C-alpha cells in the first residue's frame, strides 16, 4: 500500500522499524537532487510514520546508498540525524559492503543507519560488530556425481541442436 495513505495511528506498536527510501535522489549515479527530488522526500514519510505511531519503535534500521552521508556536503546526513535525535534515538551511520557480510557475490556498498532508544542497546550494537555467517556449500557438494543419461543432452546430430545454438546466443 502507498505509504502516503497509511495512517500509523491505526497500527499496532512495533519494536523495530526497518525501511529504506529511494536512493536515486542521493546516488552518485543520479542527479543528486536530494530532498529537492520528490523521491528523496520519502525519508520525511518515514519520519512522519515514526512520529505518529502509538509508541516509537525501540530500534530503527534505515538503508540507502553509500553516498548518503556525504551528499550535499553532509547537510543531508545532518538533517536526517537531527530528526532522529529529536525523536530520542541514539544514531549510528555505517557503510557496509554486502560482499563482506552476506553470501551475495557482489560488491554493493550501502549506508545503514541504526538507531536505538536505549543507550545500552546502542552501546551493545557498537561493541558487537556484525559477523558474516555463511550457509553456502562448496559447489562440488551439490553437483551430481553419477553419470547423466545421454537423453538429457543435445548433440550436434540432434534435430534441435542448431535451433538451441542460435537461441542461446540471441539477446532477446
Located regions from the model:
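Conserved S-adenosyl-L-methionine
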Residues: 1-2, 88-100
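Core alpha/beta nucleotide-donor-binding catalytic domains of modification enzymes
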Residues: 1-56, 65-78, 85
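S-adenosyl-L-methionine-dependent DNA methyltransferase catalytic core
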Residues: 8, 83-87, 109-172
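Short glycine-biased active-site loop of nucleotidyltransferases that positions the nucleotide triphosphate
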Residues: 8-11, 102-106
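A short helix->loop->beta-strand "cap" motif at the edges of active sites that frequently abuts
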Residues: 54-59, 109
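Short beta-strands and strand-loop turn motifs
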Residues: 59-65, 94
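Short acidic/polar capping segments at secondary-structure boundaries
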Residues: 66-67, 98-101, 118-120
Amino acid at each position: 500500500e502507498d505509504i502516503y495513505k497509511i495512517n500509523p495511528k491505526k497500527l499496532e506498536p512495533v519494536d523495530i522499524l526497518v525501511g529504506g527510501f529511494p536512493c536515486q535522489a542521493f546516488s552518485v549515479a543520479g542527479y543528486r537532487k536530494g530532498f529537492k527530488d520528490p523521491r528523496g522526500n520519502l525519508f520525511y514519510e518515514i519520519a512522519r510514520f515514526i512520529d505518529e505511531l502509538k509508541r516509537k519503535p525501540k530500534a530503527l534500521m534505515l538503508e540507502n546508498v553509500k553516498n548518503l552521508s556525504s551528499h550535499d556536503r553532509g547537510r543531508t546526513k545532518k538533517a536526517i540525524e537531527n530528526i532522529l535525535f529529536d525523536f530520542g534515538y541514539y544514531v549510528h551511520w555505517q557503510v557496509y559492503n554486502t560482499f563482506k557480510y552476506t553470501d551475495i557475490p557482489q560488491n554493493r556498498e550501502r549506508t545503514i543507519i541504526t538507531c536505538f532508544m536505549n543507550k545500552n542497546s546502542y552501546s551493545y550494537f557498537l561493541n558487537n560488530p556484525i559477523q558474516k555467517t555463511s550457509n553456502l556449500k562448496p559447489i562440488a557438494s551439490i553437483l551430481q556425481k553419477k553419470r547423466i543419461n545421454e537423453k538429457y543432452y543435445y548433440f550436434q546430430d540432434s534435430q534441435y541442436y542448431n535451433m538451441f545454438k542460435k537461441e542461446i546466443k540471441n539477446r532477446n
